[in-house]
Regions:
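Basic/polar N-terminal segments that are highly enriched at the extreme N-terminus
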Residues: 1-5
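Short, polar/flexible loop-turn hinges at active-site or ligand-entry regions and domain interfaces
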Residues: 99-106, 127
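N-terminal catalytic cores of NTP/NDP-binding nucleotidyl/phosphoryl-transfer enzymes
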Residues: 33-102
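Conserved small/polar residues in nucleotide/adenosyl-binding loops
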Residues: 125-132
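Conserved oxyanion/phosphate-binding beta-strand-loop segments in alpha/beta enzyme cores
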Residues: 8-45, 79-83, 112-113
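Hydrophobic (often cysteine-bearing) scaffold residues that line and stabilize catalytic clefts
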Residues: 13-16, 58-65, 111
């Protein structure tokens, strides 16, 4: 048991995770080519978050099941299109910006970039958007 505890104490995610994230990028795990006719296409969509702040547990409550489906379908040989987007046309983002005395566009764009990074860090297997 002491040996196992020692190994757990040595785990440093800031050292280990970036290495694997780079490897998975190299392997193209986020790549979707809907023109590839050698694999059947599978489309997956879930609710898009409001870009009004940081991601929180509610986002993962919605994203985790669809992320698992996307991974499973990829393992089955499907070409999975699982886009990530943002519901930036509502009042939550605008109200959050006004509360902070920031222009809503500036606030929304900054939060969308931050959320994209958070999704990547948490290894959500979404397809890159046309902007990425």
């Amino acid at each position: 048991m002491a040996e196992q505890d020692e190994r757990l104490e040595r785990y440093d995610p800031t050292e280990i995770e970036p290495r694997w994230q780079r490897r998975w990028e190299e392997l193209g795990l986020h790549t979707t080519d809907l023109t590839d006719t050698s694999k059947p296409n599978y489309y997956l969509l879930t609710m898009w978050p409001y870009p009004s702040g940081d991601l929180h547990i509610g986002h993962w409550y919605v994203k985790t099941p669809t992320d698992a489906i996307a991974r499973y379908k990829r393992m089955q040989g499907f070409n999975v299109f699982y886009p990530v987007g943002f519901d930036a046309f509502g009042l939550p983002a605008e109200n959050a910006a006004i509360k902070r005395k920031i222009h809503p566009r500036e606030w929304t764009v900054a939060n969308m970039e931050k959320m994209r990074l958070q999704f990547r860090i948490c290894l959500l297997y979404t397809s890159p958007s046309p902007r990425d």
